[in-house]
Amino acid sequence: MANVVVVGAQWGDEGKGKIVDWLSEQADIVARFQGGHNAGHTLVINGETYKLALLPSGVLRPSKLAVIGNGVVFDPQAFLDEVERLTKQGVAISPENLRVAENVTLILPLHRELDALRENASKATSIGTTQRGIGPAYEDKVGRRAIRLMDLADIDTLPHKIERLLTHHNALRRGLGLSEFEAGAILKELTALAPRLLPYAETVWRLLDIKRREGKRILFEGAQGALLDVDHGTYPYVTSSNTVAAQAATGTGMGPGSVGYVLGICKAYTTRVGQGPFPTELDNEIGRKIGERGREFGTNTGRPRRCGWFDAVLVRQTVRTCGIHGLALTKLDILDGFDSIEVCVGYMLDGKEIDHLPAGEGAQARVVPIYETIEGWKEPTANARSWADLPAQAVKYVRRVEELVGCPIALLSTSPEREDTILVQNPFEA
């Protein structure tokens, strides 16, 4: 298959950044297709740490074209700040190697403020958003009142579009007892940003179609994880976009038949940030040990991640909803030294055994994991680059994961460094 889609197979933070960076060496184009600057990637290249939030990981590789698709919500200031920060680290970024869909929805200060107001209003209604305006921006997109990048090229019609947007937002603010936003201030800000943003604007669907017809390889980079999908995730503790693999087509303008091989990324254990159900969560010393070893803190927020054993039920479910062809298993080295390792193979719900996570919030909270115990290993897996480097028991663990989720392991990651990767099946050649 000429193209590859990379998606998180859990709740995000699975190590997609490293895998995308590793695969991007074989790709011509790396395209983001959903989310915003709420989901960060940390990449370690030759000892240098790079933190990305909005930009595709492909920007770190010279000669690759990076693309931000229409399915993304785009914060102009966050974009400019990230470009500036990476430029200071020696990364060359310009309209020559980075294009942004002209019809991408913009995140404005009013979106960030509304997000924070909702999240901080009550602990009872908090779902753990990053308060970066992602959800409110998607709401405006669906409500057909969003400001898009292309609108900055037509300053004459922009005031009308801002007024349409404020008809909604100022009504909300009046209800909250807050002062209203002024259209003139927003117009001034967007007018000032336009010359810095418009050089990146592109008709992305057309660009990608041309490149596809030329035989170029496209790598579609997802953010977050499939269990945060607004339809297929643990609703309402989800993000505001579709994070499953099918969104790669919708979020870039490519046809579904053009997406190609679907590679799911999952950790050898499970983590989650924020609120929501987590059947295998370990609120004990083992969970803290995994978190410390794995340095489980959010790239963007710094929030500690909740940690637990590998949940084969959830990953198997994601394999189905995303149509995953192969998995990349990351952070196997974090499990080094455990005498035994637990893997969730099913759930008990109200006295009955089930093989999937139910859609209802109440039922999700009541499921109890059924565990299978697997013998651990003492020898290190860290920095392994071939199957021969792995302890026999670690190989057995990987093989058992394959059996339980019904999907082969295509890649195995044993450290944050891009070279510490074991290739089983090349997604671009599958």
From Swiss-Prot:
> Could you describe the subunit structure of this protein?
Homodimer.
Q: Which SMART domains match?
A: Adenylsucc_synt
InterPro entries recorded: Adenylosuccin_syn_GTP-bd, Adenylosuccin_syn_Lys_AS, Adenylosuccinate_synth_dom1, Adenylosuccinate_synth_dom2, Adenylosuccinate_synth_dom3, Adenylosuccinate_synthetase, P-loop_NTPase
Q: Residues in the active site?
A: D13 (proton acceptor), H41 (proton donor)
- What binding details are noted for the cofactor? Binds 1 Mg(2+) ion per subunit.
Q: Which PANTHER family match?
A: ADENYLOSUCCINATE SYNTHETASE
S-S bridge residues: none
Which positions does UniProt annotate for Mg(2+) binding? D13, G40
Q: What GO cellular-component annotations does this UniProt entry give?
A: cytoplasm
Concerning SUPFAM superfamilies, the annotation shows: P-loop containing nucleoside triphosphate hydrolases (SSF52540)
The family line of this record is: Belongs to the adenylosuccinate synthetase family.
Pfam families in alphabetical order: Adenylsucc_synt
Location comes to: Cytoplasm
What does this protein need as cofactor? Mg(2+)
Q: Which residues bind IMP?
A: D13, E14, G15, K16, N38, A39, G40, H41, T130, R144, Q224, T239, R303
Give the metabolic or biological pathway.
Answer: Purine metabolism; AMP biosynthesis via de novo pathway; AMP from IMP: step 1/2
Query: Do the record's keywords include Glycoprotein?
Result: no
State any GO BP term from the record: IMP metabolic process
Record's function text: Plays an important role in the de novo pathway of purine nucleotide biosynthesis. Catalyzes the first committed step in the biosynthesis of AMP from IMP.
Q: What is the lineage of its organism?
A: Bacteria, Pseudomonadati, Pseudomonadota, Alphaproteobacteria, Hyphomicrobiales
Give the EC number: 6.3.4.4
Please report the name of this protein according to its UniProt entry: Adenylosuccinate synthetase
Tell me the GO molecular function terms: adenylosuccinate synthase activity; GTP binding; magnesium ion binding
Residues binding substrate: T299, N300, T301, G302, R303, P304, R305
